[in-house]
């Protein structure tokens, strides 16, 4: 034995350790993969040895290889062996490897439970610490459930080192096993007051992370956190607590008022920028939520803005960005506080970082007023000229237009200035937003009538400029502006000073290089301009001038007829024929101007974006009907379609001759020159530039005219926007002087009347009058259509039915018939118990349709009251029709003689003889002074393993209940379906509010793994109760009971299928007997059908066979027999456990009879 140990020690001396492995990998760069595979083979041999030190060394090397990306899952069992070593140095290696490689899918992870429990209870704090650290990396739901109590015990350990680790790992345990949160929370709360600052920081971290998703659940800790915030000096802890308060403030308004003072003190005193930013951010959130409740908070806002200015002026780009981000939040509620720092925001436009420049641009959008609009745009225009890169320049262009056009041009006082800005923007080369500038030009010219004359003069200058035509090849380029220019000059041609000159500019040959859609607008507006000139010439008696304009049109329009664009061709051809006809009439001295101008009479106003939706569909028009009959499926797709006009000719591919090489081209050129020289009839050209082109090789001998595409710095005739800025300043100065004069006169009158005022009103944006009387044209809508009609909403919007005024008390006609629906129907006759069977098997969509129909009925009722039209008859007719259809359905289901003979068999339904007392499937869930909760659990065959829980919430208080949220602790067997992205400990919001005395229903889906046993889930309803005195946060705990009967669905079954099912021999059997039953057999069967979701297959005297089916497809068959004072139930089911539990539930129900 001693020799064996010595031999093992000698072998270990020659084993490779981690350093040797790393060194070897460095030395084998060329064949690294091969070397590592050899090392893995060696490691596998080492793991087979009994010596724990060799195994630990092997696992250490495997950990390094795992970091390089190699799979070591095959060594999971060996890692557990090293974890269980008694020596700490080996144990640490094992836990490190486990934390690197173990995950929920690791098969052997269940073997670690006892080892980890042993290490957690170890007297050595290092063994316990390494176990906690490793467990935090590979904790699974099973490990969390099994070890939760052990970790909770460690939260009270004597060593702060262990307490801190135990507190931190509890967060991972909560995530994997949410049921542990409630029992562990008291201890976690105690750790907030732990004497050790590390443990305290860990507790703050865990609770703040939990509260980040569900802040309302932690409102009760607000006093404790407030105490910590005012006493702690740890900046990291303060940041966490302040972030938590920022989330809690919207839920509890009273908390915000208390926070202002300590947060303000921290802002004044702290030098840490991170803490300063969080304080400012939270103060902003508090002031936004309390904007109506705190009348005097301007000092706090000013303090925040001043501190944010310090952040923005800092050289650190991250702090500068955060400062701008927080400033944008203040801007939404307190714009005037931010506007005073306009100079700083404009300086950020010069920053090297593009993200900071873009953030500053977003701020400028909200800082605009009538006073500073021109100044801000002027600054942005200078940045447009200096901007590097098309992306940022295009962003600047977009922002300039957004700033000026916001709120329907609210801040523009001089539209001539805005038109000049748009014209200056047309000089940008390479922009992709030409269509945006064009849209603005069109919009301003159409909406603002007073500016049309000036706009036309500027557009005519644009049409005459060469630089726009030069950029016609770029898609969405600046040439798009010509689209707007041509339309404006054509539509408002009466304002043109030189219409003939503009007409010639629009008919230039170079216009044909523009994109097709711009050429089409040119052609259409050329004829408008022609009609205007024609009218002017005829009124002046210049017949020759009118004929000359017509001749110009006839000469220039053919170039558009030859266009490759189909629309340009069509428009040009049509207009050319019209002009030729006019030319013939002019030759006969017939006046034609009036008729031509009548073609374009009237104004084209802008159409509202939603106008098309408002157009009513004519009666008799079915937009969903087929125009042509659809092709039958039998027709083969590969059938060749017949030619519509003539038989198609067989097209043969044209063989193009291969291109000649350079020698062949030179030989042909020389031969051609020789032939031309010897030809006496060939006219030789004189020496000219054309000669040079003929001497050039290839096809370049064709003469090409050199075009000067240089762009002038300033387009002639275009006014600069700076001139309008000066004119606007002078106009405002004169306006101010006139106001001062009027104010002095008023003051003198007041002195005479012995009246005094403490202060003079300051000039505001509203005092600045616009330069022109602006008449903004509104968008056109169809007759009797309003912009705010409810038709604007998407009819397929799933949230449309929830758009209800919840604060308004419910009228009698609007109350939901949730509980009344079943009570009234069941109280009339036992016949209503049968439709309950149908209701269980219906899809949830039916409820939505009913709700939508009720909404439509309400709208119709309102219209009926307004128009006083006799619509109630129609509604009554509809109800009678529904009742008739219901009656037909019942008659189909029930044989006509079923009620007469009690001894005859009754199939597929509940027996119907005696009247039953009213019953409801809704059971009480929980109640307090604020709310009452009742629920009904419904299964569906369409959704396997899922049940729908319908919860009715009734407000029993005088407060408005809002912000309601349902939290249910999932079990291993039942899980609540939550919205996508939510975790298991997140609550599900209730999609409505409850005014006093109102009830409503919410539905939730649960997924059930095994339905053979009943189970209970704990849940909490949290809500805010708001009344005149304020708002309080309340909660109501409940237990959701899933009985086995709730997993059954009433399913009809015929006697033949029922008999085959019993004969199959696949069903387990069980039975019960209940004594002391005096209820009639009819009522007894109705109770079983109603409460346990069975249907009657066949009944003979006091014996009946019944059937039901579970959501997972289990068949349940019953034979119910009634004696004099007892009832026996024999059952068969495909699952014996499910059957025994069902019979126990049935026994409890029958015992109450």
UniProtKB/Swiss-Prot annotation:
UniProt feature, compositional bias: Basic and acidic residues: 639-675, 726-740, 795-839
KW Phosphoprotein (keyword) present: yes
HEAT repeat spans: 34-71, 77-114, 142-179, 180-216, 254-292, 299-336, 338-373, 375-409, 431-468, 497-535, 548-585
Sites bearing N-acetylalanine, chain numbering: 2
Subcellular location: Cytoplasm; Golgi apparatus membrane
Region: Disordered, residue numbers: 629-696, 726-920
Keywords annotated in UniProt: Acetylation, Albinism, Coiled coil, Cytoplasm, Golgi apparatus, Hermansky-Pudlak syndrome, Membrane, Phosphoprotein, Protein transport, Repeat, Transport
Residues in coiled coil: 659-679, 725-756, 845-869
InterPro entries reported for this sequence: AP3_complex_dsu, AP3D_dom_metazoa, ARM-like, ARM-type_fold, Clathrin/coatomer_adapt-like_N
Biased composition (Basic residues): 741-758, 840-853, 863-879
Topology of the protein relative to the lipid bilayer: Peripheral membrane protein
A single GO BP: platelet dense granule organization
One family name in Pfam for this protein: Adaptin_N
Domain of life of the source: Eukaryota
Phosphothreonine: residues bearing it: 762
Keyword set includes Acetylation: yes
Chain positions found as Phosphoserine: 632, 634, 636, 658, 688, 758-759, 764, 788, 829
Summary of the tissues where the protein is detected: Present in all adult tissues examined with the highest levels in skeletal muscle, heart, pancreas and testis.
Entry's Gene Ontology cellular component terms: AP-3 adaptor complex; axon cytoplasm; early endosome; endosome membrane; glutamatergic synapse; Golgi apparatus; Golgi membrane; lysosomal membrane
Record field: compositional bias (Acidic residues): 777-794
Family indicated by similarity: Belongs to the adaptor complexes large subunit family.
Reported function: Part of the AP-3 complex, an adaptor-related complex which is not clathrin-associated. The complex is associated with the Golgi region as well as more peripheral structures. It facilitates the budding of vesicles from the Golgi membrane and may be directly involved in trafficking to lysosomes. Involved in process of CD8+ T-cell and NK cell degranulation. In concert with the BLOC-1 complex, AP-3 is required to target cargos into vesicles assembled at cell bodies for delivery into neurites and nerve terminals.
Assembly, per entry: AP-3 associates with the BLOC-1 complex. Adaptor protein complex 3 (AP-3) is a heterotetramer composed of two large adaptins (delta-type subunit AP3D1 and beta-type subunit AP3B1 or AP3B2), a medium adaptin (mu-type subunit AP3M1 or AP3M2) and a small adaptin (sigma-type subunit APS1 or AP3S2). Interacts with SLC30A2. Interacts with CLN3 (via dileucine motif); this interaction facilitates lysosomal targeting.
Disease note: Hermansky-Pudlak syndrome 10: A form of Hermansky-Pudlak syndrome, a genetically heterogeneous autosomal recessive disorder characterized by oculocutaneous albinism, bleeding due to platelet storage pool deficiency, and lysosomal storage defects. This syndrome results from defects of diverse cytoplasmic organelles including melanosomes, platelet dense granules and lysosomes. Ceroid storage in the lungs is associated with pulmonary fibrosis, a common cause of premature death in individuals with HPS.
Protein name: AP-3 complex subunit delta-1
Originating organism: Homo sapiens (Human)
Gene: AP3D1
């Amino acid at each position: 034995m001693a020799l064996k140990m010595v031999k093992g020690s000698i072998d270990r001396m020659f084993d490779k350790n981690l350093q040797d492995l790393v060194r070897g990998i460095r030395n084998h760069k060329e064949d690294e993969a091969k070397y590592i595979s050899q090392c893995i083979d060696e490691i596998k041999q080492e793991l087979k040895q009994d010596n724990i030190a060799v195994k630990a060394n092997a696992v250490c090397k495997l950990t390094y290889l795992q970091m390089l990306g190699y799979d070591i899952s095959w060594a999971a069992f060996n890692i557990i062996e090293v974890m269980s070593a008694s020596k700490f140095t080996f144990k640490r290696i094992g836990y490190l490897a486990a934390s690197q490689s173990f995950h929920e899918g690791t098969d052997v992870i269940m073997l670690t439970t006892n080892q980890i429990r042993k290490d957690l209870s170890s007297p050595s704090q290092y063994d316990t610490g390494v176990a906690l650290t490793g467990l935090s990396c590979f904790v699974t739901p099973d490990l969390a459930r099994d070890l939760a109590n052990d970790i909770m015990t460690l939260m009270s350990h004597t060593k702060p080192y262990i307490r801190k680790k135990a507190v931190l790992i509890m967060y991972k345990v909560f995530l994997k096993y949410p049921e542990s949160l409630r029992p562990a929370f008291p201890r976690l709360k105690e750790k907030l007051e732990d004497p050790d600052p590390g443990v305290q920081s860990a507790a703050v971290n865990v609770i703040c992370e939990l509260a980040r998703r569900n802040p309302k659940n932690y409102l009760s800790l607000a006093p404790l956190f407030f105490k910590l915030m005012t006493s702690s000096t740890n900046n990291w802890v303060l940041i966490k607590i302040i972030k938590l308060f920022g989330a809690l403030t919207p839920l509890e308004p009273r908390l915000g008022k208390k926070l202002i003072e300590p947060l303000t003190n921290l802002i004044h005193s702290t030098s840490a920028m991170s803490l300063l930013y969080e304080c400012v951010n939270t103060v902003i959130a508090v002031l936004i939520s309390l904007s109506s409740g705190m009348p005097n908070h301007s000092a706090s806002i000013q303090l925040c803005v001043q501190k944010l200015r310090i952040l923005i002026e800092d050289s650190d780009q991250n702090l500068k960005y955060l400062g701008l981000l927080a400033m944008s939040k203040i801007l939404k509620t307190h714009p005037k506080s931010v506007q005073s720092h306009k100079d700083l925001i404009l300086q950020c436009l010069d920053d090297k970082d593009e993200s900071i420049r873009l953030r500053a641009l977003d701020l400028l959008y909200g800082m605009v007023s009538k006073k500073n609009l021109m100044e801000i745009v002027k600054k942005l225009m200078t940045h447009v000229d200096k901007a590097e890169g098309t992306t940022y320049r295009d962003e600047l262009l977009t922002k300039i237009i957004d700033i000026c056009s916001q709120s329907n041009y609210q801040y523009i006082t001089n539209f001539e200035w805005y038109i000049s800005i748009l014209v200056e923007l047309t000089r940008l080369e390479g922009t992709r937003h030409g269509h945006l500038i064009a849209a603005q030009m069109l919009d301003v010219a159409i909406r603002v009538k007073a500016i049309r004359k000036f706009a036309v003069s500027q557009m005519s200058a644009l049409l005459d400029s060469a630089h726009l035509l030069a950029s016609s090849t770029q898609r969405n380029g600046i040439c798009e502006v010509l689209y707007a220019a041509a339309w404006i000059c054509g539509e408002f041609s009466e304002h043109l000073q030189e219409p003939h000159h503009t007409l010639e500019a629009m008919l230039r040959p170079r216009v044909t290089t523009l994109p097709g859609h711009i050429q089409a607008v040119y052609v259409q507006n050329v004829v408008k301009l022609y009609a205007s000139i024609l009218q002017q010439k005829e009124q002046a008696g210049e017949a020759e001038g009118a004929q000359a304009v017509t001749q110009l049109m006839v000469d220039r329009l053919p170039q558009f007829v030859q266009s490759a664009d189909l629309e340009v061709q069509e428009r040009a051809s049509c207009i050319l024929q019209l002009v030729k006809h006019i030319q013939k009439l002019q030759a006969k001295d017939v006046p034609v101007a009036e008729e031509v101008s009548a073609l374009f009479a009237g104004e084209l106003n802008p159409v509202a974006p939603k106008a098309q939706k408002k157009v009513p569909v004519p009666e008799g028009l079915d937009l969903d009907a087929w125009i042509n009959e659809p092709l039958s499926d039998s027709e083969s797709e590969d059938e060749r379609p017949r030619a519509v006009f003539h038989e198609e000719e067989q097209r043969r591919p044209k063989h193009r001759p291969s291109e000649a090489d350079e020698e062949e081209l030179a030989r042909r050129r020389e031969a051609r020159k020789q032939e031309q020289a010897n030809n006496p009839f060939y006219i030789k050209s004189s020496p000219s530039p054309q000669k040079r082109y003929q001497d050039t090789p290839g096809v370049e001998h064709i003469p090409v005219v050199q075009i000067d595409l240089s762009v002038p710095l300033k387009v002639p005739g275009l006014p600069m926007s700076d001139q309008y800025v000066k004119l606007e300043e002078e106009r405002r100065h004169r306006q101010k002087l006139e106001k001062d004069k009027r104010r002095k006169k008023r003051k003198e009158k007041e002195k005479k009347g012995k009246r005094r005022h403490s202060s003079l009103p300051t000039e505001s944006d509203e005092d600045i009058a616009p330069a022109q009387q602006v008449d903004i044209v509104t968008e056109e809508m169809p007759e009797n259509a309003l912009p705010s009609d409810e038709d604007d909403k998407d009819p397929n919007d799933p949230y449309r039915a929830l758009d209800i005024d919840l604060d308004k008390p419910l009228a009698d006609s609007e109350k939901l018939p949730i509980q009344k629906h079943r009570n009234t129907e069941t109280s009339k006759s036992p016949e209503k118990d049968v439709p309950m069977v149908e209701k269980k098997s219906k899809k949830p969509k039916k409820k939505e349709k009913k709700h939508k129909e009720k909404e439509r009925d309400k709208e119709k009722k309102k219209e009926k009251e307004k128009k006083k039209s006799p619509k109630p008859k129609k509604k009554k007719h509809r109800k009678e029709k529904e009742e008739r259809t219901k009656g037909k359905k019942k008659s189909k289901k029930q044989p006509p003689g079923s009620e007469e003979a009690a001894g005859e068999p009754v199939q597929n339904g509940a027996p119907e003889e005696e009247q039953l007392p009213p019953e409801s499937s809704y059971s009480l869930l929980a109640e307090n002074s604020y709310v009452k909760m009742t629920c009904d659990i419904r299964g569906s065959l369409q959704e396997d393993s899922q049940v729908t829980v319908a919860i009715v919430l009734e407000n029993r208080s005088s407060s408005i209940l809002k912000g309601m949220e349902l939290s249910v602790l999932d079990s291993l067997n039942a899980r609540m379906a939550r919205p996508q992205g939510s975790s298991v400990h997140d609550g599900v919001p209730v999609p409505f509010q409850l005014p006093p005395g109102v009830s409503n229903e919410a539905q939730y889906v649960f997924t059930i793994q095994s339905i053979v046993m009943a189970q209970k889930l704990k849940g909490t309803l949290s809500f805010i109760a708001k009344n005149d005195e304020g708002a309080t946060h309340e909660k109501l705990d409940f237990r959701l009971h899933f009985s086995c009967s709730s997993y059954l669905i009433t399913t009809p079954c015929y006697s033949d299928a029922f008999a085959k099912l019993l004969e199959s021999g696949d069903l387990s059997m069980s039975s019960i007997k209940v004594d002391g039953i005096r209820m009639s057999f009819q009522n007894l069967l109705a109770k079983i059908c109603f409460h346990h979701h069975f249907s009657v297959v066949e009944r003979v005297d006091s014996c009946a066979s019944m059937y039901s089916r579970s959501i997972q497809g289990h068949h349940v068959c019953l034979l119910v027999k009634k004696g004099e004072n007892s009832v026996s139930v024999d059952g068969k089911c495909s699952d014996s456990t499910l059957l025994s539990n069902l019979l126990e539930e049935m026994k409890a129900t029958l015992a109450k009879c």
